[in-house]
Swiss-Prot record:
This is Light-independent protochlorophyllide reductase subunit B. Keywords: 4Fe-4S, ATP-binding, Bacteriochlorophyll biosynthesis, Chlorophyll biosynthesis, Iron, Iron-sulfur, Metal-binding, Nucleotide-binding, Oxidoreductase, Photosynthesis. It comes from Heliobacterium modesticaldum (strain ATCC 51547 / Ice1). InterPro entries: ChlB/BchB/BchZ, LI-POR_suB-like_C, Nase/OxRdtase_comp1, P-CP_red_C, Protochl_reductB, Protochlorophyllide_Rdtase. Protochlorophyllide reductase is composed of three subunits; BchL, BchN and BchB. Forms a heterotetramer of two BchB and two BchN subunits. GO terms for molecular function: 4 iron, 4 sulfur cluster binding; ATP binding; metal ion binding; oxidoreductase activity, acting on iron-sulfur proteins as donors. Its cofactor is [4Fe-4S] cluster. Substrate binds at residues 416-417.
Length: 520
């Protein structure tokens, strides 16, 4: 158990809710305090449920803490069975029920004869297990409870294991993967947990192959199906040119299909990907830019591949999945200078501050950190804000997901419509007003005389002369703050009291030289 006021991963309850809440006719009874009802809010807000999410709280209050909560739980389960008539009722433990040492399995065994629904208690540790570990274990538990041997489909089909509610663009990814499979001639037998019923779980064994789309969870389910029913699986997240190619070739090998024409068609010189990555525009705006990446395992590795493929330099790549430190380090070793594994968001924020990259790729927390340091940021992984649960199709996997990401990267790094409007109508930002105030103060106070190289500084506050101010205003607004900081740091280190045009050019040459050395 860890005391924190912000975490990258949710609790075991969050993981169980993501699996159970993604499955129709499965209702979850949460045996915990009133605060654990937050699950309903998450589903209603982020996934925009048009009906009440399938969760019912069996509240633990002061009375239950004193007398025991078994009677309240039994009453809640009976009410859910009669009112909602689900196929499965999941009785999930929480930290509070664990503290009370409630035997939920005994409750389920005794109640199972009285309910129409099948009762299942997730075998997780509410204190120790985090979101993705609980998802992995519970999904495998559900599959083991219902999967039975069935004859294979005549056509080569696969099971897609991974897509769920509250995942990062996962429903959009599911639609993209479905389309990709249909285009190469492979059918989809089942998808779990999203949209999966008890009958879906029973029919999993009809597929010829399982696909684990995300490293975070689903692998245990694939291992169970391989050992119990002999169904092989592949575990590749198709994000980026190389990873998507690996994914397709592995599929083609299993299905006996030649996928080379499909890959060539999407990577052809006339295709959107090739036109973008080889254009003068992309080379001038993207090539050599310094980026940092942080997120869950799958998206951090995939984004690192993609960025290297389009010419960005990944200074470091990181993940908050500390249990897979060695595996992650090996996965990105050839792609970046440093692998950074940490689940402390403040340490990640400090590392971004010290690196000062041109662009940040991360979670919602890295978006906040980047905004604090005036750096552009793209969210590529959960945890994410509601902005990253769009209604319009927005995959990140496959070739179409790649083109969408490239658009986002290009728009974030380069000047867009906003800058054109600024050029047309002018800009009156807080930083500009502060500079004007500093300039006015400088004109009212005496400063040390400056020569061609500048004078020795007597105060920490640097002044900018009129020509330097004019030059700074011509710098694109989204990097203006960084240029100002770098120039002032350069001036202070060399003892200048005033920033002149000569100082700006000298600082520019200095930092460009450092960048070129880093690229070599």
């Amino acid at each position: 158990m860890k005391l924190a006021y912000w975490m990258y991963e949710g609790t075991a309850l969050s993981g169980i809710a993501r699996v159970a809440g993604s499955m129709p006719k499965v209702h979850t009874v949460i045996h915990g305090p009133q605060g654990d009802g937050y699950i309903n809010v998450m589903f209603s807000m982020l996934e925009r449920f048009h009906k009440l999410p399938p969760f019912t709280l069996s509240p633990i209050g002061r009375r239950e803490m004193a007398r025991g909560s078994r009677a309240r739980l039994v009453e809640t389960v009976r009410r859910v069975d009669a009112l909602h008539q689900p196929d499965v009722i999941v009785i999930t433990p929480t930290c509070s029920s664990t503290l009370l040492q409630e035997d939920l399995l005994a409750v389920a065994n005794s109640l199972g004869r009285q309910t129409k629904a099948r009762l299942i208690v997730p075998q997780v540790n509410a204190f120790r297990d985090l979101e993705h570990f609980a998802m992995d274990d519970f999904l495998a538990q559900m599959v083991a409870a219902f999967a039975v041997e069935q004859p294979k489909t005549e056509r080569f089909t696969v099971n897609l294991i991974g897509p769920s509610y509250l995942g990062f663009h996962q429903i959009h990814d599911l639609n993209e993967i479905r389309t990709m499979l249909e285009e190469i001639g492979i059918g989809v037998n089942a998808v779990i947990p999203y949209g999966a019923t008890v009958e879906t779980l029973r029919s999993l064994t009809r597929a010829h192959l399982n696909i684990c789309l995300y490293r975070e969870y689903g692998r245990e389910t694939c291992e169970y199906l391989r050992k119990r029913f002999g169904i092989d699986y592949i575990s590749i997240t198709p994000m980026g040119i190389r990873q998507t190619g690996r994914f397709l070739r592995a599929l083609g090998e299993q299905a006996g299909i030649d996928v080379t024409p499909y890959i060539r068609r999407h990577l052809a010189p006339s295709g959107a990907l090739a036109r973008f990555t080889k254009s003068v525009d992309a080379l001038s705006s993207l090539f050599g830019k310094r980026a940092v990446v942080f997120g869950d395992f799958s998206h951090a590795v995939g984004a690192t591949y993609l960025l290297r493929e389009i010419g960005l330099q990944v200074v470091w790549a990181g993940t908050y999945m500390t249990a897979w430190k060695d595996e992650f380090t090996e996965a990105v070793a050839a792609l970046t200078d440093e692998a950074f594994v940490c689940d402390d968001f403040q340490a990640v924020s400090r590392k971004i501050r010290d690196t000062q990259p041109d662009i940040v790729f991360g979670t919602q927390m890295e978006r906040h950190s980047a905004a604090r340091y005036e750096l552009p940021c793209i969210v590529i992984s959960s945890p994410a804000h509601i902005l990253n649960f769009p209604l319009f199709p927005a995959p990140v996997l496959g070739y179409r997901g790649m083109t969408r990401l490239l658009d986002t990267i290009n728009q974030t790094i380069k000047l867009g419509l906003e800058e054109h409007l600024v050029n047309m109508f002018g800009e009156d930002t807080a930083s500009e007003r502060q500079m004007e105030a500093a300039s006015a103060a400088a004109r009212g106070t005496a400063t040390a005389p400056t020569g061609a190289a500048g004078a020795v500084a007597t105060v920490d506050e640097l002044q900018w002369d009129a020509e330097a101010e004019k030059a700074l205003k011509q710098v694109p607004f989204f990097v203006r703050g960084k240029v100002q900081r770098n120039t002032e740091n350069y001036a202070r280190e060399r003892g200048y009291s005033e920033v002149t045009l000569d100082v700006i050019y000298a600082a520019k040459a200095y930092f460009e030289g450092k960048g070129n050395q880093g690229n070599r």
